[in-house]
Amino acid sequence: MDAYVFPVRVYYEDTDLAGIVYYANYLKFIERGRSEWVRSMGIDQVAMKRDAGVVFAVRRVEADYLQPAKFDDQLHVSTMISTISAARIVLDQTVLRDDVVLFSAQVTLVALDAQGRPTRLPEAFRRKIADLDTSL
């Protein structure tokens, strides 16, 4: 499966006093990348919550900050599936400037029902993933 790539521009609001991207903002960047990846598959997360009572939640993030990004940098967030099971999906996400990896993270997502309890990943979501890569 090819990576989904989402462009991100670094704005002044993203930087700290030193003029580099504040560390927590990388998590915002990869969240945007994940949300756009899901949207690109035709999954409407608002409708999924409304109709099935299911939402995605981040269970775990393991992150490495490798090099700084700076004001006005044009970045790209790359999102790829690492593993998927009935109840969770693990994504490999990177933030790049040109071909240089600045930040990498492995993110574990789970599905929660309307009561906030873990549940199986929605079938429609699993079908969309299967359409992307028949080996999953």
Which sequence ranges carry the predicted segments?
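Catalytic strand-loop segment that frames the active site of acyl-thioester-processing enzymes
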Residues: 1-36, 40-43
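Generic structural detector for well-ordered beta-strands
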Residues: 7-11, 64, 108
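Residue-level recognition of specific faces of alpha-helices
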Residues: 19, 26-29, 57, 92, ...
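Short, basic/aromatic beta-hairpin or loop at an interaction surface
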Residues: 48-56
